[in-house]
């Protein structure tokens, strides 16, 4: 596929400048060359690895995810469950759900076998040259369609940076994602903007104002119950930051330069990226 094959894309209903959109560089040709993988990670800020995972395993995990979404009332009951067609927006309380659904990953053996075992861990063991550890928490997005549900530009260090900085995100689609569905896009060379990396890139989104309202009580109650905050609870808290660099991917590209890079993704693909590359959807 060439850049000319990418259809006109939009962000929140507005057309992207297609002269500033490109394809991700594939790195499946360098899977067994550690030095080259590190060179590309340094140069690009990401490693796009189509077909790294066992597609049948990913499809099996998708089945469990679809069942959970169906039971949660998130799917259109008139369609086959495995199609994973979202329910009408009026039926879904997006504010209560929030941007992530960690319950989809909790105690999910088929999902964990994909993201925390097998080819995924084999890749990281080779890439990093030793044993690796994953987070206990899984950032699982269940994206709804529409012009108001786009993921805003951000980098991941603000969510994960309290411990070691030696971290990588493994974006793993559990659906085939044609361009029309709006898959992940990376802002070219954005990880090289040191002013941003050392500035807003050091924000900690888990900090909140402790002397306003009942924030401490809300957080303590969730911790005591061993659960995540609900979307409604999160709205009661005055957070240090939302984590977003901006609310506008088009304006962010115009400010920082570079192209938005993406591809059509298939189940089995993985996009590995560093903590400081800007991305959105």
Identify the meaning behind each predicted range.
Residues 2-44, 50-153, 159-161:
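Non-heme Fe(II)-dependent double-stranded beta-helix
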Residues 48-51, 133-136, 169, 183-186, ...:
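A structural signal for short, well-ordered beta-strand segments and their strand-loop junctions
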Residues 51-53, 174-178, 189-191:
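Short loop segments at secondary-structure junctions
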Residues 127-128, 160-179, 240, 264-267, ...:
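Short, conserved beta-strand element in jelly-roll/cupin
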Residues 139, 155-157, 172-176, 188:
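Short, structured patches in soluble enzyme cores that scaffold and shape functional sites
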Residues 157-160, 259-261:
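Short helix-to-loop capping/linker segments positioned immediately adjacent to catalytic or ligand/cofactor-binding
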Residues 158-159, 276-280:
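Histidine-centered metal-chelating micro-motifs
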Residues 180-278:
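Double-stranded beta-helix
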